[in-house]
């Protein structure tokens, strides 16, 4: 049995004024995989992520995440769905008033009930894994 994709984009159309950004885009993103949206500046990467996250509304087409049509969800249901997603945009990804350790710890503190000692251990483990051991 083949698993259903986590994200399905069907016949997506989106423009800003007279500038057509997407025309009939179809795409599937598998469950449990890290997926990168890459391309030169101005090709619509951030716009696509905002459409997927429900921050923008397409002119036509559907974006379905885990069986839910993003643009037909209530505000509350959309916020619930967003809690299960992670998006990293090309800028503004770090809190400039927090050090490296606290930037890594932040989502663990906000989205889990882990004790501080476990958050500390996980952050140190992750920093070491990417060669930032001792970073503050």
Task: Tell me what each language-model feature is.
Residues 53:
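Helix-to-loop junction immediately C-terminal to a conserved catalytic motif
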Residues 61-69:
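Conserved ABC transporter NBD signature motif
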Residues 68-69, 112, 116-135:
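Conserved ABC ATPase "signature" region
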Residues 84-85, 89-93, 98:
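ABC ATPase nucleotide-binding domain signature
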Residues 97-106:
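Short coil-to-helix segment of the ABC ATPase nucleotide-binding domain corresponding to the Q-loop/switch region
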């Amino acid at each position: 049995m083949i698993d259903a994709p986590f994200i399905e984009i069907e016949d997506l159309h989106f423009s800003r004024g007279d500038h057509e950004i997407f025309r009939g885009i179809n795409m599937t993103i598998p469950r449990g995989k890290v997926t990168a949206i890459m391309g030169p500046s101005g090709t619509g990467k951030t716009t696509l992520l905002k459409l997927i996250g429900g921050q923008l509304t397409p002119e036509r087409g559907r974006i379905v995440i885990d069986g839910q049509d993003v643009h037909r969800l209530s505000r509350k249901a959309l916020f619930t769905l967003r809690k299960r997603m992670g998006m990293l945009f090309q800028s503004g990804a770090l809190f400039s008033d927090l050090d490296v350790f606290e930037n890594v710890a932040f989502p663990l503190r906000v989205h889990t009930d882990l004790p501080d000692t476990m958050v500390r251990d996980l952050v140190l483990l992750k920093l070491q894994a990417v060669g930032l051991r001792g970073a503050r």
